[in-house]
């Protein structure tokens, strides 16, 4: 982006705070008792066994959805499901199911899956990425409901997705199998139609209604729901027949809420996020972790209470799509330089919330962001800044925290706090978190 932002000297001159006045920092690590599935491929095979295939003849094509999120165990789940289908005599395939992600193009969606380790070579089956859709009916608002032609051409479809609280809205159905049916299989047109309808009615109910129509009018045989623990590992995998999805998904969502990763601290002046990205969250940063939603018609969370957020970088897998950047208050100039506005704006229009595409206050380096936080958080003394730094919102249990936060966490049975040290900078850049 060809914009000339102020340099560090100009910005640091807006206050008289020196780096030596910043608080000392310590590593903090929260320990959790987490259950996880050791063999996800085997769990996927068991899930396939719970789905009804009686109506399908040998050799039938059964397509499994694959989304754009960086779900650690999804490649293994897909491998197990594909192998199980082949062993049953079916012809498995995978459908790229990610709304408008990947620039809303066939090649872009294929590249998105490749970046996540989901390839034809690994799965030994075809991956279909056509953006073509057909209408299968209208919802109660009179709006078209779309399904990918690749799904309609298959003999059977399995909705595979992580079930978790959504970053935009809350209700009995959030991110999961129903959303995969509506937005994933709906491709760009379906996602745009859904998000637009969601601005006029209850988002969760719109998804539920549309998912019911899609299950009725397309060859969906069921779904495989995956629930992650706070360390982003599969803790539950379940096959859900098509006629049980609407009843079972809300129950699985309640289970997922109990596993939701959160910060170990409720109140911060500044949260430093090393990476935001589309494979981390659809909003770049998980709104349930940062305590910000900024979505039309949705209330802001009561906690955590974070005054300022600084985003340091964007992941390569995002391909410059910085949707969600508007959730931050400060952003490193390198992030702005890497933005691909074509993809970002297509995605933001589809999602229906332009405020999340706003480019925050842009800083040339990390030190400048920290010094400016002293002037923009209401803290009287720099040494009292309550700061936490995390790699991403997928890893909120591993932090670097300022001394006031370290004092608060020290002594908690579930948190280990290390030695306090001054921050180290090289040409204004923080040293690596690890």
Where on the chain are the PLM-derived regions?
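Conserved, well-structured core segments that form the ligand-binding/active-site neighborhood
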Residues: 147-277
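Short glycine-rich or small-residue beta-strand-to-loop segments that form or flank ligand, phosphate
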Residues: 61-70, 93-98, 388
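C-terminal non-catalytic interaction/assembly regions of soluble proteins
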Residues: 288-292, 296-434
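Membrane helical hairpin/interfacial module
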Residues: 71, 75, 81-119
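N-terminal amphipathic/basic leader segments beginning at the initiator methionine
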Residues: 1-43
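An acidic, phosphate/nucleotide-engaging active-site surface
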Residues: 108-172
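Flexible, glycine/charged-enriched surface loops at secondary-structure junctions
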Residues: 54-59, 217, 221-224, 259-271, ...
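Glycine-rich phosphate/diphosphate-binding loops that line cofactor/substrate pockets in enzymes
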Residues: 47-63, 86-89, 264-265
């Amino acid at each position: 982006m060809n914009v000339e932002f102020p340099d560090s000297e100009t910005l640091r001159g807006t206050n008289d705070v020196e780096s030596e006045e910043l608080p000392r920092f310590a590593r903090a690590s929260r320990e959790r008792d987490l259950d996880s599935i050791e063999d996800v491929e085997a769990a996927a095979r068991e899930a396939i066994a719970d789905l009804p295939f009686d109506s399908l003849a040998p050799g039938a094509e059964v397509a499994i959805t694959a989304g754009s999120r960086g779900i650690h165990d999804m490649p293994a789940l897909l491998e197990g499901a594909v192998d199980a289908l082949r062993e049953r005599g079916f012809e498995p395939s995978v459908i790229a199911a990610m709304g408008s992600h990947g620039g809303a193009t066939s090649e872009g969606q294929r590249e998105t899956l490749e970046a996540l380790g989901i390839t034809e070579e690994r799965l030994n089956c075809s991956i279909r990425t056509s953006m073509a859709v057909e209408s299968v009916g209208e919802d109660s608002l009179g709006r078209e409901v779309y399904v990918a032609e690749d799904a309609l051409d298959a003999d059977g479809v399995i909705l595979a997705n992580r079930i978790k609280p959504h970053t935009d809205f809350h209700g009995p159905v959030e991110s999961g199998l129903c959303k995969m049916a509506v937005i994933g299989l709906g491709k760009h047109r379906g996602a745009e139609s859904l998000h637009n309808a969601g601005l006029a009615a209850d988002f969760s109910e719109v998804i539920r209604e549309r998912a019911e129509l899609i299950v009725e009018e397309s060859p969906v045989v069921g779904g495989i729901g995956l629930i992650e623990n706070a360390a982003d590992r599969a803790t539950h995998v379940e096959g859900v027949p098509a006629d049980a999805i609407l009843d079972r998904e809300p129950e699985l969502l309640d289970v997922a809420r109990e596993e939701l990763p959160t910060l170990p601290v409720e109140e911060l002046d500044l949260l430093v996020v090393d990476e935001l990205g589309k494979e981390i969250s659809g909003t770049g940063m998980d709104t349930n972790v940062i305590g910000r939603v900024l979505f039309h018609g949705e209330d802001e969370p009561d906690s955590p209470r974070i005054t300022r957020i600084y985003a340091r970088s964007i992941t390569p897998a995002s391909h410059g799509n910085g949707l969600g950047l508007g959730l931050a208050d400060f952003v490193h100039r390198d992030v702005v330089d890497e933005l691909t506005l074509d993809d970002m704006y297509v995605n933001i229009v589809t999602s229906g919330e332009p405020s999340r595409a706003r480019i925050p206050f842009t800083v040339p380096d990390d030190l400048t962001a920290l010094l400016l936080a002293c002037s923009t958080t209401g803290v009287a003394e720099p040494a009292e800044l309550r700061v936490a730094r995390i790699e991403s919102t997928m890893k909120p249990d591993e932090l670097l925290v300022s001394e006031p936060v370290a004092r608060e966490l020290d002594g908690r049975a579930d948190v280990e706090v290390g030695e306090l040290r001054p921050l180290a900078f090289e040409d204004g850049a923080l040293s690596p978190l690890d």
